[in-house]
Curated annotation (Swiss-Prot):
It comes from Phytophthora infestans (strain T30-4). Its main location: secreted. This is RxLR effector protein PexRD44. Belongs to the RxLR effector family. Disulfide bonds: none annotated. A motif (RxLR-dEER) lies at residues 54-76. Effector that is involved in host plant infection. Contributes to virulence during the early infection stage, by inhibiting plant defense responses induced by both PAMP-triggered immunity (PTI) and effector-triggered immunity (ETI). It comes from the Eukaryota.
């Protein structure tokens, strides 16, 4: 039952994010009214005059011109596009915070002369008696970030 609910929610979000309609609160003027002579194929394939889109909210018998000569009218974004932008913003904030936290430790290690290979060996030695067969990905990422920081700060001789 839970799986069915997730399928329905995902189908609803896909349908809402791929809608090709103009927003209801647009300030753009309506170009012309749609009469029964307009074929639905023109609206569905966007072959209509001046790339018009159907205005689905409010008075549904109107067409809004989305591409005007003065500037391009920005269509309301779908749910998936908004979610993607929000996740990218969260990721950027996290990476910025992560660098702020890691850089002081990187500076201390660089002052001690710790190389990239020594750091990797330290992680391997620490994991020997833990029961794991390899180095966890978090340790590998930390070592990779240290190596990238060494290259960025001009200490490439330590990034061996």
């Amino acid at each position: 039952m839970r799986l069915l609910l997730w399928v329905l929610i995902s189908m609803l979000s896909i349908a809402l994010s791929s809608c090709a309609a103009a927003s209801a609160d647009s300030n753009e003027r309506l170009v012309r009214a749609v009469y029964s002579t307009v074929r639905s194929r023109d609206l569905a394939t966007d072959d209509g005059p001046k790339h018009t889109k159907r205005f689905l909210r409010g008075e549904s018998s109107k067409i809004v011109n989305l591409k005007q000569e003065e500037g391009v009218f920005e269509e309301r974004k779908g749910v998936s596009q908004k979610l993607t932008k929000a996740l990218q913003a969260i990721k950027a904030r996290y990476l910025k915070w992560e660098q702020k936290v890691l850089v002081p430790g990187f500076k201390k290690m660089a002052e001690k002369g710790v190389t990239y290979s020594e750091l990797r060996d330290t992680f391997r030695v620490r994991m020997m008696n833990s029961g794991r067969w390899g180095t966890p990905s978090g340790f590998k990422r930390y070592a990779r970030l240290y190596s990238e920081w060494l290259h960025r700060t001009g200490r490439s001789h330590l990034a061996k």
